[in-house]
Amino acid sequence: MNEYHVLVVEDDKEILDGIGIYLKNQGYTVYKAGNGKDGLSIIEQEEIHLAIVDIMMPVMDGITMVMKLRENHDFPVIFLSAKSEELDKITGLNIGADDYVTKPFTPMELLARVNSQLRRYSKY
C-alpha cells in the first residue's frame, strides 16, 4: 500500500467509478467527486496528493476548479478530457494542470502518468 491520496473529479459515473477501482487496486486512497465544486470541498477537508479532473462538468467545470485550487494548493493535477485539440491542451496546462490525458484512455496510461507526477511531487 502507498500513502498517496488521489482525488478523481468526473461527472461520468462509469468513468469515475472505473478510475476509482483501478487506483484503489494499485494501493491509492481515492476520493471521488462529480463536479468541481464538490472536488474543492474534498480538497479543503482531506489531504490530497494528486487530482485527476475532467474539464467539462456541470455546476463547476474543471478549468474553474483548477484555477481556484491553485490559489492555495500546489499538488499535481492531471486533466482528463474528450477535448483533444492542441489549444485545449495548452489552455489546460497554462491554467495550472501538470498533465493532460485525452479520452478514450487506457488505465495503464493513466496510472503511469499518476505515478510519474507523484514521483516528481514527492521530491519537493
Where are these regions (language model features)?
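N-terminal/domain-start alpha-helical segments
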Residues: 1-122
